[in-house]
């Protein structure tokens, strides 16, 4: 029999110490990685519940195990809330990750050797959209589209490629693209060439739920997403689809890719979907965009750095560091030493290797969750530029660390 007195700190102090150290890092550093966010206490409570004990292969009302009457309620809540949030015909909340959701789409609609078309990873796409080392690039014939001279999606070239190659699937979505995507235009060309139109909205899902970014659901055959990032839920994946594709997608997830779903994570997803339907969440997403725009403006117009695509229309943007003679890898490290967390990122036509890069990616979701507004966003942008202007100056790094500490103390992630 278990005892509530057997806390993690008591049972495994070594692991507890590592978790506490990570908690301090999250509180004491400004998080600007665009794919990261902080979840609510309610989301964590659901994910840490006894639902982790239950096996539930199958779907609500059709399980391969007994005793699923309560997890059926949990999963159906998540499904219904998700469909309502995005206006979808059908939804699957079981994918353990965005990558597995993407694999399910490929399994449902294509066979190895078929042609798929997605955005080039080198120009802002995602590795699961056809990167050569990923399953999507190894199993399928990949045609990649990219950006034009303005560093915006080259829709005309994309359409020409689609007509030439007639892919089985056309993918819209990105991991490092700051602008709005014209999903309606993608849908038109997909219909013209007879392709399944799939949108990966992982980065933009929270903005879409709040109405601040175009909703792909009315236009796409299938839409995938993670549940973290801007959606501010637990780490996991989801799939939205038109009614006629529900059976194919559900079969691809189970039994195609996964066995028993993680019902404790699905419960946490359900909480996040409920939170995302509130006015407070809409206000949050409005602030996310405002903060990103302020940082891009300050870094670009006031501090002389080049912003890829010239602006942001979302939560994220890329900074070209070549004028500072510093690589993305070096910038990530030195900013990290100043307690500002970013990630190195390739820029279009990057001369550096992918693990070095000429740029960094900056995102505003996590900093906005802790309460930062345009005032703090402007301060943070100047702190970033100060570090990039003098990456070897210990006094500058110490001063910036101090300023970061003051901001973090004023805006704790998890207050009382």
From Swiss-Prot:
Species lineage: Bacteria, Pseudomonadati, Pseudomonadota, Betaproteobacteria, Rhodocyclales
Positions of (6S)-5,6,7,8-tetrahydrofolate binding: 121, 125-127
Family membership noted in the UniProt record: Belongs to the SHMT family.
EC number: 2.1.2.1
General function of this protein: Catalyzes the reversible interconversion of serine and glycine with tetrahydrofolate (THF) serving as the one-carbon carrier. This reaction serves as the major source of one-carbon groups required for the biosynthesis of purines, thymidylate, methionine, and other important biomolecules. Also exhibits THF-independent aldolase activity toward beta-hydroxyamino acids, producing glycine and aldehydes, via a retro-aldol mechanism.
Bridged cysteine pairs (disulfide): none
Entry GO terms, CC: cytosol
Keywords: Amino-acid biosynthesis, Cytoplasm, One-carbon metabolism, Pyridoxal phosphate, Transferase
GO BP, sorted A to Z: glycine biosynthetic process from serine; tetrahydrofolate interconversion
Pfam family, one: SHMT
Gene3D superfamilies per the UniProt record, alphabetical: Aspartate Aminotransferase, domain 1, Type I PLP-dependent aspartate aminotransferase-like (Major domain)
InterPro entries (alphabetical): PyrdxlP-dep_Trfase, PyrdxlP-dep_Trfase_major, PyrdxlP-dep_Trfase_small, Ser_HO-MeTrfase, Ser_HO-MeTrfase-like, Ser_HO-MeTrfase_PLP_BS, SHMT-like_dom
UniProt key word Flavoprotein: no
Organism per entry: Azoarcus sp. (strain BH72)
Pathway the protein takes part in: One-carbon metabolism; tetrahydrofolate interconversion; Amino-acid biosynthesis; glycine biosynthesis; glycine from L-serine: step 1/1
Protein name (record): Serine hydroxymethyltransferase
């Amino acid at each position: 029999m278990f005892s509530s007195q057997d806390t993690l700190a008591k049972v495994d102090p070594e692991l507890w110490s590592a978790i506490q150290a990570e908690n301090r890092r999250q509180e004491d550093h400004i998080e600007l990685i665009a794919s990261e966010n902080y979840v609510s206490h309610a989301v964590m409570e659901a994910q840490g519940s006894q639902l982790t004990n239950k096996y539930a292969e199958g779907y609500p009302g059709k399980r391969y195990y007994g005793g699923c009457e309560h997890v059926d309620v949990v999963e159906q809540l998540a499904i219904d809330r998700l469909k309502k949030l995005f206006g979808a015909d059908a939804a699957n909340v079981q994918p353990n990750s965005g990558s597995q959701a993407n694999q399910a789409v490929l399994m449902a609609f294509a066979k190895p050797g078929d042609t798929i078309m997605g955005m080039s990873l080198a120009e802002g796409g995602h590795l699961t959209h056809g990167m050569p080392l990923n399953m999507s690039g190894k199993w399928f014939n990949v045609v990649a589209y990219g950006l034009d001279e303005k560093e915006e999606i080259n829709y005309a070239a994309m359409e020409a490629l689609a007509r030439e190659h007639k892919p089985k699937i056309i993918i819209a979505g990105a991991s490092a693209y700051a602008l709005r995507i014209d999903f309606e235009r993608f849908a038109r060309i997909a219909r013209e060439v007879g392709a399944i139109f799939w949108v990966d909205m992982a980065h933009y899902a929270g903005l879409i739920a709040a109405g601040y970014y175009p909703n792909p659901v009315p236009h796409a055959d299938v839409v995938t997403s993670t549940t973290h990032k801007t959606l501010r839920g637990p780490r996991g994946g989801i799939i939205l689809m038109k009614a006629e594709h529900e059976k194919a997608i559900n079969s691809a997830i189970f039994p195609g890719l996964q066995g028993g779903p993680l019902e404790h994570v699905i419960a946490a997803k359900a909480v996040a979907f409920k939170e995302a339907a509130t006015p407070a969440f809409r206000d949050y997403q409005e602030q996310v965009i405002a903060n990103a725009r302020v940082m891009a403006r300050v870094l670009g117009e006031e501090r002389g750095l080049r912003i890829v695509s010239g602006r942001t229309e979302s939560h994220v943007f890329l900074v070209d560091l070549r004028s500072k003679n510093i690589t993305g890898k070096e910038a990530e490290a030195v900013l990290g030493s100043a307690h500002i967390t970013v990630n190195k990122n390739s820029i279009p036509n990057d001369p550096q290797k992918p693990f070095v890069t000429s740029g960094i990616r900056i995102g505003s979701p996590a900093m906005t969750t802790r309460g930062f507004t345009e005032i703090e966003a402007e301060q943070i942008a100047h702190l970033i530029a100060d570090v990039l202007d003098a990456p070897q100056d210990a006094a500058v790094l110490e001063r910036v660390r101090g300023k970061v500490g003051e901001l973090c103390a004023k805006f704790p992630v998890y207050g009382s």
